[in-house]
């Protein structure tokens, strides 16, 4: 206590009371402080015990956490290695995929170009197809016309074969008539030599018949064919011994000439048909070269072989060749009044 704070006492009792009261005060404060110290020491011991317990728990926890930390560190290292490996693999895979993507894009562009080219080629093929169909329809139309014409020619060939048989018979008849005329010429010559000044009425009739036959055109085949076959039947059967009249002979000769002319016309038709088949074959080859061999060439070959076979068949029937120039004509009038010269 400071000296300035000590009061001044008047008496010693006051001073003793003052110091006695002050000592009691300090004693009381000492007791209170001692009690507080004991309480503090007890609390400190309890707190120390508690702190030691907590420290042990904390150390145990630290050890556990360190173990966990080490374990996690090992896991982290392994995960880092795996991550690095996965990153490397992913980088490689991404590189490969990028290469594949670039190649795929290139292939896609090529496919787009190829598709455009295919579309253009398809358009060209469609146009060529339409042109080919048009050409094929035209060819089929021409082929049908050729088939119809061939059928018509077949019928004419059949008619020609029958006519060739008739011509051969008429040639035989003409040969017989020529021989008969030669005999009649001989007889007429003998008769003329025996009576030169008086010609017979038969010779006059013969001369007039010959002149009439020379002045008249050829008799149509359709009108005189029945007469010719009737005359041939009469000669073949020997139903009459009388000789044919000069007009009948001239009519038969005219029929033979008409038959031969018709045979020549048929030969010319066959030649024209053969030329038509050659034209069709040339057209077929042209269409095949333009459209890529779309038309089979066997049809024209068949048509050509058909015409050739018919043409050869017509040439070989009865040994008659269309180019041999076989004709029967009415010869000019001879110097003798009754002589007739026939040529086959």
Curated annotation (Swiss-Prot):
This is Nuclear distribution protein nudE-like 1-A. It is found in: Cytoplasm, Cytoskeleton; Cytoplasm, Cytoskeleton, Microtubule organizing center, Centrosome; Cytoplasm, Cytoskeleton, Spindle. GO terms for molecular function: microtubule binding. One of its GO terms (cellular component) is spindle. The lineage of its organism: Eukaryota, Metazoa, Chordata, Craniata, Vertebrata. Residues 181-209, 322-344 are annotated as: Disordered. Belongs to the nudE family. Required for organization of the cellular microtubule array and microtubule anchoring at the centrosome. Positively regulates the activity of the minus-end directed microtubule motor protein dynein. May enhance dynein-mediated microtubule sliding by targeting dynein to the microtubule plus end. Residues 26-187 form a coiled coil. The keyword Cytoplasm applies. Its main location: cytoplasm. It comes from Danio rerio. Residues 181-190 have a biased composition (Basic and acidic residues). PANTHER family: NUCLEAR DISTRIBUTION PROTEIN NUDE HOMOLOG 1, NUCLEAR DISTRIBUTION PROTEIN NUDE-LIKE 1. Keywords: Coiled coil, Cytoplasm, Cytoskeleton, Microtubule, Phosphoprotein, Transport. GO terms for biological process: cell migration; centrosome localization; chromosome segregation; establishment of chromosome localization; establishment of mitotic spindle orientation; microtubule nucleation; mitotic centrosome separation; regulation of neuron projection development. Phosphorylated in mitosis. It holds the Pfam family NUDE_C. The keyword Mitochondrion does not apply.
